[in-house]
Amino acid sequence: MQYQAYIVRPDGHIVNRVDVVCTDEVEARRLAKQVVDRNAVELWQGDRLIERFEPEE
């Protein structure tokens, strides 16, 4: 399955997209969490938002 992880700045602008190919949504969530750094990450599958992961403070 194909997913998109969008790196989102605090002002809401997308700064990057990472295409993720995984066997299932659980794996996609795990990989998206690993991408979180200073910016939030939104995990999408097509036009469906799966989850938004916020950076730890």
Regions found by a protein language model. Name each.
Residues 24-38:
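A short, charged, amphipathic alpha-helix used as a generic interaction element across diverse proteins
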Residues 6, 21, 44:
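Residues in well-ordered beta-strands of folded domains
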Residues 37-57:
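Short, mixed-charge low-complexity intrinsically disordered segments
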